[in-house]
Amino acid sequence: MPFLTVAGARAHYVHRRPVPASRPPVVFIHGAGGTHQQWLYPVRDLSLSLTYALDLPGHGKSEGPGRDSITAYSDWLVAFLDALGLEQAVLVGHSMGGGIAQDVALRHPDRAAGLGLIATGARLRVTPAIFDGLRQDPEAVVRLVCDLVFGPETPPEMVRLGRRQMGAIPPDVLCGDFVACDAFDVMARLGEIGVPTLVLCGSQDVMTPVKYSTYLRDQIRGATLHLVEGAGHMVMVERPDAVLQALTTFLQQLQQSKL
């Protein structure tokens, strides 16, 4: 389980290095209250790509305080890429992680070789009830969020695992994540993104509905949209095979476009 020093604190990540690695490196970014564990299937099974899945600061095994803005998280991500020695990577982000990926593409366009925007949006408003609940009963908020993020066909044991994983995130870090999401809004700037982009979401996502992904597809030049039927917000956990197939096709097309 490798660690790097990023912004003065230890950052944890997992990675896979196939031989040969003939496609651009891929960095997976989890969402609010998440960890690298949500990306274990694509990290393990995405062939021909050097893959990394990280724990954002304050999450999982990464040390340091969490952040309370998307720009602060994206600055941290750029420092993470520097520490790895990666000049460019395909940034694949889920929910808040998708916001981070968009922000890097807008403010540090030379660092993004492509984007995978998974169950996310150009604006990520959070209901005030979440913030009220975090102050009064964080455990209840975790239960509520996990009841919403999984699709109707999700096995109960997967929902319970999600609750345990999110419940392990310190409440102040979780609150900072939601503050970051609530303030995020790049709806007017999507036309500035100039890298190949895959947009993917579940048809039953109630957190970032399909219309969010449709807007991303329509506003980012050349973006493609892949809809996973029956899946909810945690589409990469619920339907890892479908997400892996879509990412593989996207990376193949990205590689061919650079030949």
Residue ranges and their predicted role:
Residues 9-63:
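Conserved HGGG/HGGXW glycine-rich cap/lid loop of the alpha/beta-hydrolase fold
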Residues 193, 199-201, 205:
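Short beta-strand/loop motif that positions the catalytic acidic residue
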Residues 30, 89, 93-95, 202:
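Conserved alpha/beta-hydrolase "nucleophile elbow" surrounding the catalytic nucleophile
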